[in-house]
Amino acid sequence: MAKPTFKRQCYIKRHLRPLYRKHSRCSSINLGHGNYSLYINRVLKEVVPNRGISSYSVDIMNILINDIFERIATEACQQMFLRKRCTLTPGDIQQAVHLLLPKKLATLAVTFGSKAVHRFIHS
Protein backbone atom coordinates (compact mmCIF):
# COMPACT_ATOMS: atom_id res chain seq x y z
CA MET A 1 0.00 0.00 0.00
CA ALA A 2 1.40 3.37 -0.98
CA LYS A 3 1.91 6.12 1.55
CA PRO A 4 -0.34 9.12 1.11
CA THR A 5 1.64 12.18 0.18
CA PHE A 6 0.78 15.55 1.56
CA LYS A 7 1.83 18.74 -0.12
CA ARG A 8 3.49 21.14 2.23
CA GLN A 9 2.68 24.66 1.38
CA CYS A 10 5.03 27.31 2.66
CA TYR A 11 3.73 30.83 2.77
CA ILE A 12 5.82 33.89 3.20
CA LYS A 13 4.34 36.09 5.92
CA ARG A 14 4.34 39.24 3.86
CA HIS A 15 2.14 37.60 1.24
CA LEU A 16 -0.55 36.68 3.72
CA ARG A 17 -3.42 39.02 4.24
CA PRO A 18 -3.30 40.92 7.55
CA LEU A 19 -6.45 39.14 8.71
CA TYR A 20 -4.66 35.80 8.76
CA ARG A 21 -1.60 37.07 10.60
CA LYS A 22 -3.52 38.34 13.60
CA HIS A 23 -4.82 35.07 15.02
CA SER A 24 -3.82 35.62 18.64
CA ARG A 25 -4.57 39.34 18.79
CA CYS A 26 -7.14 39.04 21.55
CA SER A 27 -6.74 36.27 24.11
CA SER A 28 -10.35 36.59 25.31
CA ILE A 29 -11.56 35.16 21.99
CA ASN A 30 -9.50 32.03 22.56
CA LEU A 31 -10.83 31.62 26.10
CA GLY A 32 -14.44 32.03 25.08
CA HIS A 33 -15.00 35.11 27.23
CA GLY A 34 -16.55 38.18 25.72
CA ASN A 35 -15.29 41.71 25.99
CA TYR A 36 -18.18 44.03 26.79
CA SER A 37 -16.28 47.32 27.15
CA LEU A 38 -17.93 48.85 24.09
CA TYR A 39 -21.40 48.02 25.40
CA ILE A 40 -20.58 49.25 28.91
CA ASN A 41 -19.55 52.61 27.48
CA ARG A 42 -22.67 52.79 25.29
CA VAL A 43 -24.99 52.09 28.22
CA LEU A 44 -23.15 54.63 30.37
CA LYS A 45 -23.50 57.32 27.69
CA GLU A 46 -27.20 56.50 27.36
CA VAL A 47 -27.85 56.69 31.10
CA VAL A 48 -25.48 59.55 32.04
CA PRO A 49 -24.38 61.38 28.86
CA ASN A 50 -21.75 63.68 30.37
CA ARG A 51 -19.84 61.15 32.51
CA GLY A 52 -16.95 58.83 31.73
CA ILE A 53 -15.55 55.62 33.17
CA SER A 54 -11.96 54.54 33.76
CA SER A 55 -10.50 51.54 31.98
CA TYR A 56 -9.95 49.81 35.34
CA SER A 57 -13.67 50.14 36.13
CA VAL A 58 -14.57 48.82 32.68
CA ASP A 59 -12.33 45.80 33.31
CA ILE A 60 -14.07 45.14 36.63
CA MET A 61 -17.49 45.40 34.96
CA ASN A 62 -16.29 43.06 32.21
CA ILE A 63 -15.18 40.47 34.77
CA LEU A 64 -18.51 40.82 36.57
CA ILE A 65 -20.53 40.25 33.38
CA ASN A 66 -18.44 37.23 32.37
CA ASP A 67 -18.83 35.75 35.86
CA ILE A 68 -22.61 36.17 35.85
CA PHE A 69 -22.89 34.61 32.38
CA GLU A 70 -20.72 31.68 33.44
CA ARG A 71 -22.81 31.08 36.57
CA ILE A 72 -26.06 31.22 34.59
CA ALA A 73 -24.68 28.79 32.00
CA THR A 74 -23.48 26.37 34.67
CA GLU A 75 -26.80 26.45 36.53
CA ALA A 76 -28.77 26.05 33.29
CA CYS A 77 -26.69 22.99 32.36
CA GLN A 78 -27.37 21.49 35.78
CA GLN A 79 -31.10 22.06 35.26
CA MET A 80 -30.85 20.39 31.86
CA PHE A 81 -29.11 17.33 33.32
CA LEU A 82 -31.58 17.11 36.20
CA ARG A 83 -34.43 16.86 33.70
CA LYS A 84 -32.43 14.25 31.74
CA ARG A 85 -32.51 16.16 28.47
CA CYS A 86 -29.85 16.93 25.89
CA THR A 87 -31.24 20.28 24.76
CA LEU A 88 -30.85 23.54 26.61
CA THR A 89 -34.16 25.41 26.49
CA PRO A 90 -35.03 29.01 27.33
CA GLY A 91 -36.93 27.66 30.33
CA ASP A 92 -33.70 26.22 31.75
CA ILE A 93 -31.97 29.58 31.39
CA GLN A 94 -34.91 31.43 32.96
CA GLN A 95 -34.99 29.03 35.89
CA ALA A 96 -31.22 29.45 36.37
CA VAL A 97 -31.66 33.23 36.42
CA HIS A 98 -34.43 32.91 39.02
CA LEU A 99 -32.19 30.69 41.17
CA LEU A 100 -29.14 32.96 40.99
CA LEU A 101 -30.51 36.50 41.12
CA PRO A 102 -32.75 38.20 43.70
CA LYS A 103 -36.49 38.08 43.01
CA LYS A 104 -37.11 41.52 41.50
CA LEU A 105 -33.86 41.55 39.53
CA ALA A 106 -34.55 38.05 38.18
CA THR A 107 -38.03 38.97 36.95
CA LEU A 108 -36.68 42.11 35.26
CA ALA A 109 -33.82 40.16 33.67
CA VAL A 110 -36.15 37.47 32.33
CA THR A 111 -38.64 40.06 31.03
CA PHE A 112 -36.05 42.18 29.22
CA GLY A 113 -34.24 39.07 27.96
CA SER A 114 -37.45 37.64 26.52
CA LYS A 115 -38.21 40.95 24.81
CA ALA A 116 -34.71 41.10 23.33
CA VAL A 117 -34.94 37.54 21.99
CA HIS A 118 -38.39 38.25 20.55
CA ARG A 119 -37.11 41.40 18.80
CA PHE A 120 -34.10 39.49 17.45
CA ILE A 121 -36.20 36.65 16.06
CA HIS A 122 -38.84 38.87 14.49
CA SER A 123 -36.57 41.53 13.01
Curated annotation (Swiss-Prot):
Gene Ontology molecular function terms on file: DNA binding; protein heterodimerization activity; structural constituent of chromatin
InterPro entries: Histone-fold, Histone_H2A/H2B/H3, Histone_H2B
Stored Gene3D superfamilies: Histone, subunit A
Annotated transmembrane regions: none
Known tissue expression: Present in testis (at protein level). Not detected in other tissues tested.
Pfam families from the UniProt entry: Histone
Function: May act as an acrosome-nuclear docking protein in sperm.
Protein name: Histone H2B variant L1
Gene that specifies this protein: H2bl1
